[in-house]
């Protein structure tokens, strides 16, 4: 990718970061996302506290109550967080200090071009980072780079938009949505589970676990708006009911139809010796 394109991408996320900071009040959906991510890590990563961990963007840590890296940071000091936006990194560092978490290794870089040594990371967490690229080729480049940075027997836990969700629209509609200014940020391409598995295997990783998480419809903004509207209308009296509703929807992960209802696909992939 050319230097100008990299700059434009960083500028876009800087703008999103400034808006996100102003418009990101705590919400139940974000609380639910954090809980789900931590549960997924507990299931798929046997963390001892000494692992070298990489998280591939810092958007939640900068602005959202769905952040979970600070929770990991209180147990381990060997965490690297990256983001293409200096605005997002600066805000993530401010919030990290409020949680007494070391942010000295929060780096500004593109996930496709990591300033990391090969075979250096024990665990890589990539939650909905790679579905913000304009092409599947960009996703493949990023996956190749993550595989390079991961050590042998290291684990990659990755989530992406689920294109087989019954409410996932054709990408033409997504483009129109963005042109109308209805999307808060750039919505990129994604991969099916089969496509993701194939690329990971080409890069020397085997998918040991897969699932679908967050069983609610597209787009996220509509779900958040509905939640906030109900909370405001009921003056908080529906908060418990909303939490119970999200917990009930989580049960769909145990159904055979989970890939039709899950908002994201999630995989655990392990790197093996060449």
Q: Where do the protein language model's features map onto the residues?
A:
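Conserved class I S-adenosyl-L-methionine
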Residues: 1-54, 157-179
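Acceptor-substrate binding/catalytic loop of class I
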Residues: 32, 179-195
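Class I SAM-dependent methyltransferase SAM/SAH-binding core
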Residues: 54-113
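A short acidic, Gly/Pro-enriched loop at the edge of an enzyme's catalytic core
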Residues: 112-124
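A short SAM/SAH-binding and catalytic strip from SAM-dependent methyltransferases
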Residues: 123-137
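A short glycine-rich, Lys/Arg-flanked "PGG" loop and its adjoining helix->strand segment in the class I
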Residues: 140-152
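A C-terminal cap/extension of S-adenosyl-L-methionine-dependent methyltransferases
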Residues: 209-274
